[in-house]
């Protein structure tokens, strides 16, 4: 049975993406792993919390997802992986929740996630990577 690797990608942070490329490529070589890339876009209530009106200022969620998928597919081209082993997922909502849900669904043998070095807000609020490490049912590689 082939291993399955989940790689959450923040499409707005190319520096983090650069950090995980070599790790994903090396892990994917083992057993010709299937690699599932995921990006998560905030749900519409998040935008409303910023004071933006739903209809007047925001594109439709389907348009946001299509644009996010296009950006993620461009990012994936940087990885040297067989295209028949790559899967693309775009979800809406809380990144940590969507990562954990997809990890269970596919099911993932490993999650490779990039993370910034902790700062004061991380200690107060927690990070997505920390939540994934705490709650994932598979191995998690955090790349800093």
Swiss-Prot record:
Native organism is: Escherichia coli (strain K12)
Subunit-structure text: Homodimer.
Instruction: Tell me a GO biological process for this protein.
Output: regulation of bacterial-type flagellum-dependent cell motility
Which InterPro entries does this UniProt record tie to the protein?
Answer: Rossmann-like_a/b/a_fold, Universal_stress_UspA, UspA
Q: Which domain of life is it from?
A: Bacteria
Family that this chain belongs to = Belongs to the universal stress protein A family.
Query: Which PANTHER family does this entry report, sorted A to Z?
Result: STRESS RESPONSE PROTEIN NHAX, UNIVERSAL STRESS PROTEIN F
Q: Which Pfam families match?
A: Usp (PF00582)
- Which protein, by its recorded name, is this? Universal stress protein F
- GO MF entries: ATP binding
């Amino acid at each position: 049975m082939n291993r399955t690797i989940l790689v959450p990608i923040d499409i707005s942070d190319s520096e983090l993406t650069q950090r995980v490329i070599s790790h994903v490529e090396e892990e994917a070589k083992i057993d010709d792993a299937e690699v599932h890339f995921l990006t998560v876009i905030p749900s519409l209530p998040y935008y409303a919390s910023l004071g933006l009106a739903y209809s007047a200022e925001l594109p439709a969620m389907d348009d946001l997802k299509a644009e996010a998928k296009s950006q993620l597919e461009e990012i994936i081209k940087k990885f040297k992986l067989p295209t028949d082993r790559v899967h693309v997922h775009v979800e809406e909502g809380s990144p940590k929740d969507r990562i954990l849900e997809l990890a269970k669904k596919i099911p993932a043998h490993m999650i490779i996630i990039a993370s910034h070095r902790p700062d004061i807000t991380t200690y107060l609020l927690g990070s997505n990577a920390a939540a994934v490490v705490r709650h994932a049912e598979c191995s998690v590689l955090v790349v800093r």
